């Protein structure tokens, strides 16, 4: 079965420079760097397996004649919201994902975002490039507020693989970690977790690491932001839909928050008029990065190794990382 598989990669450019040679050595592979929605059906046609990262596979496509040979969807990511899992399950199409591959990369990037907001290294670098240091009347520049992390509190919302690694790294800086219970739960949760509202009230920094679900959409809204400490920081390297963008922008404009850093938006790539993209060009206390927290070279290699293992398991009739 393995040698007869026909596989199509729909958005291989998202894997960067990671080699796909092991796939092409084993199976008949077609590799597309990007796939627009209108191109998906044609490229899926006649294929046994789809490998994708963020291309949308909905019920309409799965119902079309193009998908009649489709047996497996290999999601090269942890999140599965771009694939209609129920529709795939109903049609006997196996769907697998790759959990945990980028935990170290995302945690490291999260800490980098915290450090950037706390120390403004990038801002000072920009001032030097602009010639501001040469014109300074004193030996230094003190244009940006900065603070030490030691003795501050970090609230972590979402305590899976990534949240745990962030907590481990944060303790090395002397941060106290406060772990939020699942949204909607009452009282202390497992492992001494605190109600979300209490974490928001007590934390100097709040970092989001939970999945986007109907329960967590706009989890950080105007009400949640009002609970946060004056001068607190917000970090979101999870999902854009967790935060009400307009409410966040207002809190930053009014200086109720000292800063925010987001690596994810509700639409990616964003349109030029996305509220957070526009605000990032105006506000010096907002940092937006292009959904790259996951993308360390080691994480991308780990991702493709796991996708390969998922497909190999499928050829043996075994379940591995199956989500539908």
Where do the PLM segments sit?
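Glycine-rich Rossmann-fold phosphate-binding loop(s) that bind the pyrophosphate
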Residues: 12, 159-160
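Phosphate-binding beta-alpha-beta segment of Rossmann-like dinucleotide-binding domains, i.e.
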Residues: 99-153, 168
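Rossmann-like adenosine-cofactor binding region
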Residues: 57-63, 176-178, 182-275
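An N-terminal-biased, well-structured beta-alpha scaffold segment characteristic
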Residues: 1-96, 201, 221, 227
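N-terminal Rossmann-fold NAD(P) dinucleotide-binding loop
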Residues: 163-164
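Short, Asp-centered acidic motifs that coordinate Mg2+ and/or phosphate
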Residues: 48-49, 72, 205, 233, ...
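Rossmann-like dinucleotide-binding domain for NAD(H)/NADP(H)
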Residues: 95, 231-233, 237-324
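Short, conserved active-site loop motifs that form the nucleotide-linked donor/cofactor pocket
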Residues: 27, 93, 191, 285-287
């Amino acid at each position: 079965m393995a040698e007869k598989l026909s596989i199509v990669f729909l958005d291989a450019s998202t894997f960067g420079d990671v080699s796909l040679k092991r796939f092409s050595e084993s199976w008949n592979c077609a590799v597309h760097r990007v796939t627009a929605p209108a191109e998906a059906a044609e490229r899926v046609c006649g294929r046994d397996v789809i490998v994708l990262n963020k291309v949308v596979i909905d019920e309409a496509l799965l119902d079309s004649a193009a998908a009649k040979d489709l047996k497996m969807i290999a999601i090269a990511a942890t999140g599965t919201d771009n694939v209609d899992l129920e529709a795939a399950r109903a049609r006997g199409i196996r769907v697998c994902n790759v959990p945990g591959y980028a935990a170290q990369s995302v945690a490291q990037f999260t800490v980098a975002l915290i450090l950037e907001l706390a120390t403004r290294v990038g801002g000072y670098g920009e001032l030097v490039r602009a010639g501001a240091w040469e014109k300074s009347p004193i030996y230094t520049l003190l244009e940006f507020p900065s603070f030490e992390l030691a003795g501050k509190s970090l609230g972590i919302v979402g305590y899976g693989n990534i949240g745990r690694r962030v907590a481990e790294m944060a303790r090395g800086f002397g941060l106290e970690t406060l772990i939020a219970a699942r949204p909607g739960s009452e009282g202390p949760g497992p492992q001494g977790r605190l109600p979300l509202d209490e974490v928001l009230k007590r934390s100097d920094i709040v970092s989001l690491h939970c999945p986007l679900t109907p329960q967590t959409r706009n989890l950080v809204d105007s009400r949640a932001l009002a609970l946060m400490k004056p001068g607190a920081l917000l970090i979101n390297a999870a999902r854009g839909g967790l935060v009400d963008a307009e409410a966040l922008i207002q809190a930053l404009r009014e200086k109720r928050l000292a800063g925010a850093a987001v690596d994810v938006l509700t639409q990616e790539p964003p349109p030029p008029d996305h509220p957070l993209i526009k605000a990032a060009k105006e506000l010096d206390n907002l940092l937006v990065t292009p959904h790259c927290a996951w993308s360390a070279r080691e994480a991308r290699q780990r991702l493709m190794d796991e996708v390969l293992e998922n497909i190999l398991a499928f050829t043996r009739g075994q379940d591995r990382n199956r989500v539908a």
